[in-house]
Amino acid sequence: MALVINDRVKETSTTSGTGTLNLAGASQDFISFVSGVGNGNTTYYCITETGTDKFEVGIGTVTDATPDTLSRDTVISNNLGTTNEIDFGSGEKEVFCTIPAVKAMSPVMNPTTYVVTHNSTLSDDQ
């Protein structure tokens, strides 16, 4: 379906391992992935494991189910500096929508003239 990015989308999960995350509902004062992104849509996500330096940023697909889930389709970055799924341990993880740094345009760039190619390097000089 569509790539959807939304503000204030955040849930928790206790799923361990490298697979699809079971989502535990919206964190206080936030909205759920199903409400903010929508069933079947993809989004950029970040997962952080409480009490550790583990994190993963990627693109995932939201599924409205019991429980709601977020698949980890493409990993963009992680704390190991690779594009592999992080093997999260037991315990709580925070999962939220984000825009990965490699996908963000610098505010000093002119979006009408700047073209990103597969080999582009972004800097404030552009």
Please provide the spans of the model-predicted regions.
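Glycine-rich, low-complexity segments
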Residues: 1-25, 29-30, 67, 76-124
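Ser/Thr/Gly-rich low-complexity blocks that favor extended beta-strand/coil architectures
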Residues: 33-59
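Elongated alpha-helical scaffolds
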Residues: 53-71
